[in-house]
């Protein structure tokens, strides 16, 4: 097989390769707010800033106007750093306890990844999960057959996480990639797509398997085309703000994108 001009693909985790609908983090955010402060947020509010590191995510939820209004009504002030610390402290053990339940690969993910490896493409990965959570998730995903060549967690680097390029570029360094334009970043969230842009990579957004559509795999399988199109449009509206080079439904559609990027690289195009 001809060697691909693509050197590496860097995948997000939840909603991209594992955990269809990205339910592990969302449901836990709702529970952490409840446990930390007996404060209610809904799943839509929990999903809003997905893709950020989890401390930053909690802060961003607190800044949603409707959440801030309810927080002020309950506590007489907006959320402060100590509040975020307390919610994060509740989040961590809950997430570690639950993340393995959501480690099953998304349909066709393993086949697609193995196809990339067969072409000599390295598999990087990064996540909005902290290292403590990734240390639980990585071996369970490996049991399912998913073993990327490198993993970066959101708190691994002192420079920080998304939407900055640091996690993606750490993959570049550790995988020995010689040219960022030969890399593809795949994600289901806008911060993860911005991360790819900021690192100088091709970017691919996922419409139906991730956070923005918010479908369970069962809902996805049972949905008629009108329901899927409505979910696509909802996700597209959010992801287009980050201007991905490609938007596809799920990882199953990725091989066509790979072929197109290979063609464009061969023609001398850049991201």
Curated annotation (Swiss-Prot):
Gene3D superfamilies: HAD superfamily/HAD-like, Putative phosphatase, domain 2. It catalyses: phosphonoacetaldehyde + H2O = acetaldehyde + phosphate + H(+). Keywords: Hydrolase, Magnesium, Metal-binding, Schiff base. InterPro entries: HAD-like_hydrolase_sf, HAD-like_sf, HAD-SF_hydro_IA, HAD_sf, PGP-like_dom2, Phosphonoacetald_hydro. It is an enzyme of class 3 (hydrolase). Binds 1 Mg(2+) ion per subunit. Its cofactor is Mg(2+). CDD domains: HAD_PHN. One of its GO terms (molecular function) is magnesium ion binding. Its EC number is 3.11.1.1. GO terms for cellular component: cytosol. GO terms for biological process: DNA repair; organic phosphonate catabolic process. The active site is at 12 (nucleophile), 54 (schiff-base intermediate with substrate). SUPFAM superfamilies: HAD-like. Mg(2+) binds at residues 12, 14, 188. Involved in phosphonate degradation. Homodimer. Belongs to the HAD-like hydrolase superfamily. PhnX family. This is Phosphonoacetaldehyde hydrolase. It comes from Vibrio vulnificus (strain YJ016).
């Amino acid at each position: 097989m001809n060697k691909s001009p693509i050197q590496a693909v860097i995948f997000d985790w939840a909603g991209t390769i594992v955990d269809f609908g990205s339910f592990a983090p969302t449901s836990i955010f709702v529970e952490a707010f409840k446990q930390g402060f007996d404060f209610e947020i809904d799943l839509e509010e929990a999903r809003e800033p997905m893709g950020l590191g989890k401390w930053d995510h909690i802060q961003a939820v607190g800044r949603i106007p409707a959440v801030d209004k309810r927080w002020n009504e309950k506590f007489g002030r907006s959320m402060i750093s100590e509040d975020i610390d307390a919610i994060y402290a509740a989040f961590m053990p809950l997430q570690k306890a639950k993340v393995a339940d959501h480690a099953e690969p998304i349909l066709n993910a393993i086949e697609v990844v193995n196809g990339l490896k067969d072409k000599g493409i390295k598999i990087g990965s990064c996540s909005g999960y902290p290292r403590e959570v990734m240390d639980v998730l990585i071996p369970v995903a490996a049991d399912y057959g998913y073993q990327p060549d490198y993993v970066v967690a959101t708190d691994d680097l002192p420079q920080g996480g998304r939407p900055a390029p640091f996690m993606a570029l750490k993959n570049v360094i550790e995988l020995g990639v010689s040219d960022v334009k030969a890399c593809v970043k795949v994600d289901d969230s806008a911060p993860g797509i911005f991360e790819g842009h900021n690192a100088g990579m091709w970017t691919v957004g996922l419409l139906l398997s991730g956070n923005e559509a918010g479908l369970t795999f069962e809902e996805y399988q049972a949905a008629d085309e009108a329901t899927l199109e409505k979910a696509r449009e909802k996700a597209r509206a959010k992801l287009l703000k980050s201007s991905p080079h490609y938007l596809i439904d799920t990882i199953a559609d990725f091989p066509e994108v790979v072929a197109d990027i290979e063609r464009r690289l061969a023609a001398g195009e850049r991201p």
